[in-house]
From Swiss-Prot:
Mostly found as a homodimer in solution; non-covalently bound. Keywords: Calcium channel impairing toxin, Disulfide bond, Ion channel impairing toxin, Metal-binding, Secreted, Signal, Toxin, Voltage-gated calcium channel impairing toxin. It is found in: Secreted. Disulfide bonds join 36-77, 44-60, 48-56, 83-115, 87-97. GO terms for cellular component: extracellular region. Negative results: does not modulate desensitization of the ionotropic glutamate receptor AMPA GRIA2, despite its high degree of structural similarity to Conus striatus con-ikot-ikot (AC P0CB20) which blocks desensitization of these receptor types. Shows no inhibition on Cav1.2/CACNA1A, Nav1.4/SCN4A, Nav1.7/SCN9A, Kv11.1/KCNH2, Kv1.2/KCNA2, Kv1.3/KCNA3, Kv4.3/KCND3 channels. Shows very weak inhibition (IC(50)>30 uM) on Cav2.1/CACNA1A, Cav2.2/CACNA1B, Cav3.1/CACNA1G, Cav3.2/CACNA1H, Cav3.3/CACNA1I, Kv1.1/KCNA1, and Kv1.2/KCNA2. Does not modulate all recombinant GPCRs tested (more than 50). Residues 22-26 form a propeptide. Expressed by the venom duct. It comes from Conus mucronatus. This is Macroconotoxin Mu8.1. The cysteine framework is VIII (C-C-C-C-C-C-C-C-C-C). The keyword Nucleotide-binding does not apply. Residues 1-21 form the signal peptide.
Amino acid sequence: MDMKMTFSGLVLVVLVTTVVGSSVRRGENSDNLTHCRLFEFRLCLLECMSLTLDHCYARCTTVITQIHGSDTNRFDCTIFKTCYYRCYVLGKTEDHCWKGTATSVTGDVGDLEFC
């Protein structure tokens, strides 16, 4: 089994076993986070990066879109994912990036200047 298939299988298991609509922390922009499936994107990204695979942002965007539908790839969702990913690859802690994205990113294009 190649690494790509293994990753896809692992992500599917993680996403299917995750309680859909998991509670989000108080103060988060929960409607957009739920709609964009940012929680699931986060889990996928962490799994992908732990396996040191390439192109994790693109891989996880594709996986989430396939599982939850094309609405998860709308413009506002792309902004959430981009801000979270930028923070994480800058070496910030995962918890810091999650809290920051969840509490301050609204999905507006202006968010990209500050995330």
